[in-house]
Amino acid sequence: MKKSRIYLLLLVVFLNPSYAQEDSYTSTVLAPGYNQLTFDAPVPGSYTLASYKPASNGNVIDADGLNKSLHDIYDDKIVLLNFMYSTCADVNGCPLATAVFHKIKNILDKDPVIGKQVSMISLSFDPENDSPDVMKLYGDGTDSGSVDWKFLTTNSVKDLD
């Protein structure tokens, strides 16, 4: 009986997250706006936003391996487009952009009427490593039924010009 109590105690200790060691490779997120701001944000309407324009067209490959035009994928929706590559290890680069997209998607999922008007596109600019199969794996679990999030790649960087 005493032995089983010791095993139970060890099990509780090892499974309790408060006893877990922190990863030795933690990184500081340096991108402004991701964490709490260290300054007061400007009052809405007190500044001018940059002009946005449509992204250039290009030849892309969807996660099913089908060749498409980037503009054909827009599907007359509001498009949020980020450029990434699956092997990016810079915490303030692609992983941060993907985390921000997840946050946006979670917000849009709460309002399907708006969510269905938005198309999110993560486009790899590393065709050598990011095949359609890799992009499909990268996008697994992002389909919510309301927000359309596509993971695309291309045959070459030249195809994006």
Please give the residue ranges for each predicted region:
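N-terminal targeting signals for export/organelle localization
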Residues: 1-57, 61
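Short, flexible, glycine/charge-rich loop motifs used to bind or transfer phosphoryl groups or to couple energy/partner
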Residues: 48, 69-71, 110-111, 142
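Extracytoplasmic/periplasmic, Sec-exported soluble proteins
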Residues: 50-52, 62, 71-73, 89-96, ...
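Extracytoplasmic
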Residues: 53-55, 73-80, 115-118, 130, ...
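Short active-site neighborhood of thiol/selenol oxidoreductases, capturing the structured segment around
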Residues: 69-100, 120-121
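Structural microenvironment flanking redox-active thiols in thiol-disulfide oxidoreductases
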Residues: 96-161
